[in-house]
Amino acid sequence: MMQKGALNVHKIREDFPILKRKLSGDKPLVYLDNAATTQKPLAVINAISDYYMNYNSNIHRAVHQLAEEATLEFEKTREKVAKFINAKSTEDIIFTRNATEAINLVAYSWGRANVKKDDRIVITEIEHHSNIVPWQILTSEKGAKLEYVGTDDDGYLKLQEYKNYLDSSMKAKLVSVSHMSNVLGTIVPVDDMIKMSHEKGIPVVIDGAQSVPHMHVDVQRMDCDFMAFSAHKMLGPTGVGVLYVKQEILEKMPPFIGGGDMIKEVHKYETRYNDLPYKFEGGTPNIADVIGFGAAIDYLNNIGMDKVREHEVELTEYALDKITAVKGVTVYGPHNTKDRGGVISFNIGDIHPHDLATIMNDHGVAIRSGHHCAQVLMERLDVAATSRASFYIYNTKEEVDVFISALEEARRLFKI
């Protein structure tokens, strides 16, 4: 059920115990590292505790009441995930440890069965290492080639370059692209890219780790073939990821991990695999945290993803106006908030990002500094690292003001 009007952020903040913390002695926590992970509401914490306190059991196996209750709650989360991204069926939803494992599953299972020598896989310069390294491993193993779509100086992908790769006589075997950059905040026009790719018969993987938590994502409308994302970036626990795969593709893919629960029958020299999606979920899964993820989805649904996006746009516009007025600051990525999410990466003068993050921490402000697992993009930007502030539903304009005040103090301290 969607709330009416703008988000009541101060009411939302009451649901997050950690936001009552203080850093550096007496400084209220200003948490601006949401692109790395988000904080957890009480509903999620309580759902996990409830499992361990009241119906802790393995799933899909025993017939006793605890097992049946645990299985029911686990599978309820799969249903919630399918509805959240508008998947056709729960059979299209595979639980993994994280988005990284989800992309590796595609590379290992689909990739090793389909990619051949001299084939090409197309990715982009904005990718997280999770959407680079698996393809490097695969192309190296298969004698295939990895191609990169570049970005312009404003952080937009060069779509003509992308089109050229698709039109080349050496046809690409697969495209894998982030829906939203974890550094630039760029929202990639994946709908258009998927359509262009499908016109050439090329399947597309979408890394939705930064988009699914922040906006309404509809995999059927988007028509992607694969999508990966993580629970912990959308109020859920760590250790849970999701891989969505179109069923007609998933049915042809070999298993990723062998073991219990992904089988129907095992004999000395042969095995009959389980039905979808269990064929890809070998071993005891992260039951408690999958159940906690279900509570996180309920929480976001109660707010409404359109409201989440509206709040972040408003906050990002406010922050961009403030930060671009600070002397010596360079902001990376699009300045039009229609084209970017709630992520602002920046540098200020010659202050090292780690030094800046330390000063921020002294003011109670938690930001990220470093290469953000995107060293290919850092090379494109010609920097070793950046500082990054990223927003979510519980952040306020007052917190942005604290962040900017700390930034101004750093500027004065370093005489910029």
Region locations from a protein language model:
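Pyridoxal 5′-phosphate
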Residues: 1-416
